[in-house]
Amino acid sequence: VLVQFYENDKKNINLLMEHIKISFPEITSLLYIVNQKANNTMYDQDVVCYNGEDYIMEEMDGLHFKIGAKSFFQTNSEQAKILYRKTKELAQITKNDLVYDLYTGTGTIAQYVATSAKKVVGIDSVEEGIKAAYENAERNNIENCTFYTGDMKEIFTDEFIAKNGTPDVIITDPPRDGMHKKVVEQI
């Protein structure tokens, strides 16, 4: 559980966090941030681990994923399994295919399709997510995934493709309206 506060009132933060900890002993990871920007972005904020681990573990079809507070992971794991299975099925990835996973997060989809692909390249802007993607790939004994951190519109260029290879399959999750025009043009 990650609780976001606006006011940096240590006394009240500790009172609430202790209440949550005592009231819900099944919580294995209790974190908080103080975000005085009054918005819902937290990637530039410090995460404080109040109790337990600063991550959770998730299993999906035999793959194991460590997920930190700033790492993207689908919130409904059961539906994510269905989505990833369908993605793999529809993409018809073969052992000869180079796959790009744009907005890879913790590398979940990249690793999910890696067993069918020659190589998978994942890109995301969140450094913590890419670090977790590498850790997860190692944890899952997946050696054909490479991950890059950077702003998609800056990193996903002709030079990047020349260096890493022209993809046979590109996966974007989500296929967002907010995808920068340069990224859409590159695809």
What are these regions (language model features)?
Residues 1-8:
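Carbohydrate-binding surface patches
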